[in-house]
């Protein structure tokens, strides 16, 4: 194993893209854009884009460039949505779907070199897309699915975090699940799309600051925006972070290792 996954708190700008950019594009953006974090859609039955570039060598190289990594698993989706692969309404079955997705995500994390040598460590965000919180059965099933995910991830020694909208996190009371969701990647978009240097994970319209308040938040603050930095244009969703992401240590020695104490400004350490 050439890389060891390490979790650290990143404070700064990040982005996600449905299809991961090329190594050359990412290297250019690291030099010229305000972004220092990038999402990795590592897998899941509901992942939209193939992300065929993703493998351990690719991830090692972008970590060597200096990127902070946000592994994300796009598994089954709430049964009251139109997604092709829902988890069941039955809460016991939904819980098991969460467990199974955690097992699959763990295997993929290990394949990509994102875990420690003992198969533990790392953080991965479960992507749960928007659902109708007025549908009580759907809310109950979704809560059970997330509990299955976090329960199994705790057993595996991996931080099983969650991507969801601020409305869903609040109205479905995801903040009071047991075991607790350790960190959240919150979808709440600004009215104006695109990069915003003043974007924050706090003072949101639909989620009080009381929940996930201690370096436990990422936020997707815009979506579907073409941005150009250093002459390279990529369609992205801009994000801001004050929460757990990954860096890689034990990299081959061609470049300095990224410190796990992370800061969003020009790649400098705290």
Region spans (language model):
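Active-site-adjacent substructure of cysteine-protease-like catalytic cores
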Residues: 142, 146-149, 168-176
């Amino acid at each position: 194993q050439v890389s060891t996954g390490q979790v650290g708190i990143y404070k700064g700008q990040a982005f996600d893209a449905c299809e991961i950019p090329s190594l050359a594009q990412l290297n250019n953006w690291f030099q010229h854009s305000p972004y220092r974090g990038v999402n990795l859609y590592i897998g899941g039955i509901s992942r939209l884009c193939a992300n065929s570039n993703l493998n351990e060598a690719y991830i090692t190289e972008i970590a060597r460039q200096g990127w902070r990594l946000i592994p994300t698993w796009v598994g089954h989706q709430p049964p009251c949505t139109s997604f092709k692969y829902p988890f069941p309404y039955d809460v016991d079955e939904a819980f098991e779907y969460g467990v199974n997705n955690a097992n699959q995500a763990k295997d993929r994390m290990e394949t990509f070199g994102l875990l420690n040598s003992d198969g533990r460590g790392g953080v991965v965000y479960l992507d749960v897309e928007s659902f109708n919180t007025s549908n009580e059965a759907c809310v109950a099933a979704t809560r059970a699915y997330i509990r299955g995910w976090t329960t199994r991830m705790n057993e595996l020694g991996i931080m099983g975090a969650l991507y969801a909208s601020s409305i869903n996190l609040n109205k479905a009371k995801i903040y009071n699940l047991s075991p607790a969701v350790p960190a959240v990647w919150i979808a709440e978009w600004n009215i104006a799309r695109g990069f915003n240097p003043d974007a924050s994970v706090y003072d949101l319209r639909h989620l009080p600051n009381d929940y996930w308040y201690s370096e436990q938040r990422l936020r997707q603050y815009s979506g579907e925006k073409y941005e150009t930095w250093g002459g390279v244009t990529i369609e992205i969703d801009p994000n801001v972070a004050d929460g757990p992401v990954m860096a890689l240590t034990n990299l081959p020695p061609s470049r300095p290792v990224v410190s796990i104490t992370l800061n969003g400004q020009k790649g400098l350490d705290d």
